[in-house]
A protein has these predicted regions:
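Small-residue (G/S/T/A) turn/hinge positions that recur once per unit in extracellular repeat modules
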Residues: 181-184, 219-220, 245, 269, ...
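Short glycine/acidic-rich loop motifs that flank beta-strands on beta-rich extracellular proteins
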Residues: 142-145, 165-166, 172-177, 198-211, ...
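Extracellular beta-strand solenoid repeats
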Residues: 133, 159-161, 170, 178, ...
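Extracellular/surface-exposed low-complexity segments
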Residues: 4-124, 368-393, 400, 406-407, ...
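Extracellular beta-strand-rich solenoid/capping regions of secreted or surface-exposed proteins
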Residues: 128, 140-163, 168-193, 197-223, ...
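Secondary-structure capping and domain/repeat boundary segments
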Residues: 628-709
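Short, T/G/N/S-enriched strand-turn elements that build extracellular solenoid repeat scaffolds
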Residues: 119-126, 140-153, 175, 535-540, ...
Length: 709
């Protein structure tokens, strides 16, 4: 109904202090009426067709019911005015007594009808629940910072918005914004972008209370929406810095900062511990250096971080742009990293401080990440896309929990790297075409290892996913130097090691394979697995027969539960000698005969695999072992030139195992058969048909038939 819409217009005029002409009012009314449904139904609020007491409520109602859009109405009015040949008559503006036209013309910001020369001046004047409008792009003439208690300003629910189009605030040398115990919302997703140009800003490390270009200090709550932060080359610290409280970054862009960090939040031990809320989402980080695009450093506070649906590209430092640092830290962390995309990112100097951590809880959830083309340029341990303080544990030395779900790490240096202690759970993740041989980590003594996974301490639980077509000097798919990895399922194929361990290189670590298949991997030694630690197999675990498990001196495979595949693996020992244990059965009755048929031995001469419980005690082998054994041939000689019927076929005897003489009795006319003897000229039988040969007869034998004279 028209009357109601006119009331809406009046309410709009009153609440927004807009100067709406009668012509504009009529056009707006007509536009609103056009947006009613065809049946002309009128709408009411709270059951009344009377005065509307809230334009916002009515707008929300109309948006839901009739797709009402104030922006669409205004656009229609602007278009109609542009087509009108008559110039509109400007209404004389009434200025407050304390504002002259000259002041308004020179003012870059306004609060209500009061204008201020720059953003800093407006912040010194703003009160709770007020909005600062940036009406002109300008350079700040002074900082708004926390220096002394007498200069500290606190305010709540203040907004900072651009007005009349995109606006830029340039921050000259040493000029910055630092909010203290305040709540501020900067920018809006529904407004034009607000840009902060930091090209002249330098922030020395000594200014540790407000060492970012824009700071949320002492428990402030600051939200950034639809903002651009650029040209931070002179920064020695951060574009956005939060310390205790809440920082939210949504739909923002950070670009061209070769000497700083995009977003950082921290909790210094100099202040009372509290909880930090840290959220970065729907934003773009392009060309961020120093210690990462997003960084959080905590000392004693509890922290909740959410980093979601961002794009990180060309970020040279920090795990594809995300990194954390603890020094020292004792409180709990909960971090969720989800739906981010990383392109052409590097890792540089990482975790140069903060090696003392005793966290009560460190929980990180990483999901739906896409990493493409990152590199390692650091002299620190060779890690690739993610390192340490996130889902890998790094220098966090206790109680670290992390999960990685539905991620893809491709065309980088390493897929996943975990250092020190901790526990990482991986689900439905792909590590593909990474090349650890390109890592620049010579000073660590670990250059080029672990194309898919680099594990040096801690635990990784791989529930599902694929590790394929990665390259490394050692450990094409997985490299372990200490630590433990549990493989429950997955496909590990096409990985290549220049030296050892095409699938896995295990040096002093523990591999527990309960499922999954290694196939088509290549290496000079150990195409499937190079096992120089502990390697346990069970269930559906499989190393395809085209790959092998190489066993250095005194190393073997442990079978923890019944294996399903036949064969489950092919083993290659460092040396072929009788009694060399290659498999140990560690479940049930613990006898080698329970599993020995599920393993193959890479062929060499007469050697084969036999169960230890079949062997004589004089062999010195364990009953739970599967060992290397020699295979001996037992031949039967009729010991006459005459024709003999029913001669036994050759049989086999194994090292330190008993073997039965054939039960078949040869027949030579009516000449009585006396038995078999190793001596061709013997007069009596040494062995009778069906009798066992001695276990210690570890040689090829020819048994001669002995006939009665």
């Amino acid at each position: 109904d028209t009357k109601m819409y006119l009331e809406v217009v009046e309410e709009w005029k009153r609440r927004e202090e807009a100067l709406i002409s009668e012509e504009e009012k009529q056009s707006l009314t007509e536009a609103l009426i056009k947006m009613l449904p065809e049946n002309g139904q009128s709408y009411v609020i709270d059951g009344k067709e009377s005065r509307v007491d809230s334009l916002q409520r009515y707008g929300e109602f109309l948006q839901t019911q009739v797709s009402f859009s104030v922006e669409a109405c205004l656009e229609e009015i602007r278009n109609s005015r542009a087509d009108d040949k008559e110039e509109p008559v400007e209404k004389e503006e009434t200025l407050p007594d304390n504002v002259s036209k000259e002041q308004k013309a020179e003012g870059a910001c306004r609060i209500g009808n009061t204008y201020y020369e720059d953003l800093s001046a407006a912040l010194h004047a703003v009160k709770d629940n007020e909005t600062i409008y940036i009406v002109q792009s300008h350079a700040m003439k002074d900082s708004f910072v926390y220096v002394e208690k007498t200069r500290t300003r606190k305010f709540q629910n203040v907004r900072i918005l651009p007005e009349g189009g995109p606006r830029t605030v340039r921050m000259p040398d040493r000029h910055r914004l630092a909010f203290t115990k305040s709540s501020v919302a900067i920018g809006s997703k529904g407004s034009d972008p607000l840009t902060f140009d930091l090209s002249g800003t330098s922030v020395p490390d000594s200014d540790n209370l407000y060492c970012g270009a824009i700071c949320a200090n002492k428990g402030s709550s600051v939200t950034f929406e639809n903002c651009v932060f650029q040209n931070g080359d002179q920064l020695s610290r951060w574009m956005i810095h939060g310390e205790y409280g809440s920082v939210t970054v949504d739909q923002c862009k950070f670009q061209n900062c070769d000497n700083g960090v995009g977003v950082v939040t921290e909790a210094s031990s100099a202040f009372t511990p509290t909880e930090i809320s840290f959220r970065v989402q729907n934003s773009v980080f392009d060309g961020i250096a120093d210690i990462g695009a997003v960084h959080f450093s905590i000392h004693r506070a509890n922290i909740r971080a959410e980093i979601q649906n961002n794009v990180f590209k060309n970020c040279r430092i920090g795990i594809g742009g995300i990194r954390s640092d603890e020094a020292p830290y004792t409180g709990p962390i909960s971090a969720r990293i989800q739906g981010n995309t990383f392109q052409n990112c590097y890792i540089g100097e990482s975790f140069s401080q903060g090696t003392s951590v005793a966290a009560s809880a460190f929980q990180v959830n990483v999901s739906n990440e896409r990493y493409h083309g990152w590199q390692s340029t650091s002299q620190h341990p060779n890690v690739g896309d993610l390192y340490s303080g996130w889902f890998s544990t790094g220098f966090c030395n206790s109680n670290v929990e992390a999960s990685v779900n539905g991620c893809s790490y491709e065309n980088g240096v390493h897929g996943i790297a975990t250092m020190s202690k901790g526990r990482t759970v991986v689900n439905n993740t792909t590590l593909a075409r990474n090349n650890a041989r390109e890592a620049n980590t010579e000073q660590c003594g670990q250059k080029g290892n672990g194309g898919g996974i680099f594990l040096n301490g801690g635990t990784i639980i791989w529930n599902s996913g694929t590790i394929c077509e990665n390259q490394a000097d050692r450990g094409g798919a997985i490299y372990l130097k200490d630590g433990e990895i549990l493989l429950k399922d997955g496909s590990f194929y096409g990985n290549r090691a220049q030296n050892r361990g095409g699938g896995i290189y295990n040096q002093n670590g523990t591999v527990k394979q309960e499922g999954g298949n290694f196939s088509a991997n290549t290496a000079e030694i150990g195409s499937g697995v190079y096992q120089d630690g502990i390697y346990q197999m069970s269930g559906s675990a499989l190393v395809d027969e085209g790959n092998d498990v190489y066993l250095p001196a005194e190393k073997y495979i442990e079978v923890m539960q019944k294996l399903q595949s036949v064969p489950a693996a092919r083993v290659t020992p460092d040396r072929y000698e009788n009694g060399r244990m290659v498999v140990k059965v560690n479940y049930g009755n613990r006898t080698g005969s329970m599993e020995w048929e599920r393993f193959l031995l890479t062929p060499q001469s007469r050697y084969c695999l036999r169960p230890g419980d079949y062997q004589d005690r004089r062999a010195g082998t364990l009953k739970e072992a599967v060992t290397i054994s020699s295979e001996y041939t037992v031949q039967y000689d009729k010991n006459t030139k005459a024709q003999v019927e029913q001669m036994p076929e050759p049989s086999v005897k194994y090292w330190y195992e008993k073997a039965a003489v054939s039960e078949q009795i040869p027949k030579w006319l009516d000449v009585p058969f006396l038995g078999w003897n190793e001596n061709q000229t013997a007069k009596e039988g040494q062995y009778q048909p069906g009798e066992n040969l001695p276990a210690e007869k570890n040689q090829d034998l020819t048994l001669y038939a002995i006939w009665e004279d």
